[in-house]
Amino acid sequence: GEEKFFEATMSDSGVILLAPHIGNWEILAFYLCDEIKSTWLYQPPKFDLLDNLITKSRSRAGIVMTPTNRTGVSNVLSALNRGEVVGILPDQVPPIEGGKFSPFFGEPALTMTLVSKLVQRTPAKVFCGIAKRLPNGIGYKVVVEEAMDGIYSSKLEESLAALNETIEKSILTTVEQYSWEYKRFRKTSDGSRFY
């Protein structure tokens, strides 16, 4: 899948690279975007000192980090309009106003609508990538695949379902490396506590 990803970066359409919490997304970003301009959305930590440290280390490969707020979304849209790569961690739990419930491994999960909205506003191609840890700490294997076709649907429900199916497919390649502690189901459609 890397070939198709790199081919897509040569067009002026922009590329959305989904990087679920599997293995190490920073390794994925450094590897795939080493010589490609890219902008990555991230959730800033509450402590400025920690934020500065994290941003500095993640930016050393020329990766632009932008926060998950209005400014960040605007930066991401601008990057796509310039034909650049945008990295998004699609399994982050959004605020209620930034998501809709969609099945994730058979359970309703609050799913970000951002990717679906970006796809409708730009001609960007969507890929999903992971950097799987190899046994005995010998390194990582980068795997990149095109997102499920349904992600391009103008129907939000279909697009969100395809987004979650894309994430599920990646998780199933290395279940033990997914960050299950992330509590993807912490917000429920009926307000009850899942955890």
Where are these regions (language model features)?
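Non-catalytic C-terminal accessory region of glycerolipid acyltransferases
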Residues: 9-11, 34-37, 71-195
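A short, well-structured juxtamembrane/interface segment
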Residues: 1-14, 23
